[in-house]
């Protein structure tokens, strides 16, 4: 019988016509810039302590949104989550802030910037380095590998490969050093790459 070849031919014709009719713009959209990544991962203060609302607000307050939106940039950015900023504020202003909501933590970050203008910019630039460092590289470098940040200070990377993370040693010897959050690695952008981290990197000993 010739029914099976006819069905196959008809199916091929339908497939070919569908492909031919697909619009040229149907290709996958390019990834967003680092600013777009941060906008997508953050927003207004909410009840989720493990996104990046407070960092997004800090970037805006520090006037760094355009730098992260620059298509010519080529950066690795470490993203402290909201809980990381809560820990920073509690360390600066007292342990009662462990019971505060995100909006209150944000108000204290604004207070910090008001009392010492440029502080947020300094801190945020300490979280960015030139070039793209993916998690595979971060987990394979020698322990204590230095990275020079855009702020000018140094962060040292020490892999803990069996846990799928790395510790980032900052300039504050008395705090808990942040580590890469395994579920927030290799967030791709058109102008760089980002990794979530557990605490805020500190460019000075607080």
Regions found by a protein language model. Give the residues of each.
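Mature, structured domains of secreted/extracytosolic soluble proteins
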Residues: 3-9, 16-18, 22-206
């Amino acid at each position: 019988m010739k029914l099976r070849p006819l069905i196959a031919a008809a199916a091929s014709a339908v497939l070919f016509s569908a492909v031919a009719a697909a619009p040229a713009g149907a290709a996958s959209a390019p990834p967003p810039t680092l600013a777009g990544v941060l906008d997508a991962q953050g927003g207004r203060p909410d009840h989720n302590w493990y996104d990046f609302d407070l960092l997004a607000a800090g970037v805006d307050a520090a006037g760094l949104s355009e730098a992260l939106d620059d298509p010519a940039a080529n950066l690795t950015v470490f993203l402290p989550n909201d809980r990381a900023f809560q820990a920073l504020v509690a360390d600066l202003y007292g342990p009662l802030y462990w019971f505060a909501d995100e909006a209150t933590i944000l108000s204290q970050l604004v207070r910090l910037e008001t009392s010492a203008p440029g502080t947020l910019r300094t801190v945020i630039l300490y979280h960015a380095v030139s070039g793209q460092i993916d998690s595979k590289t971060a987990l394979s470098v020698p322990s204590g590998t230095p990275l020079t940040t855009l702020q000018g200070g140094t962060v040292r990377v020490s892999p803990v490969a069996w846990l799928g993370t790395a510790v980032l040693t900052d300039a504050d010897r008395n705090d808990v050093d942040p580590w890469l959050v395994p579920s927030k690695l290799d967030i791709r952008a058109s102008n760089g790459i980002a990794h979530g981290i557990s605490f805020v990197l500190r460019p000075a000993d607080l």
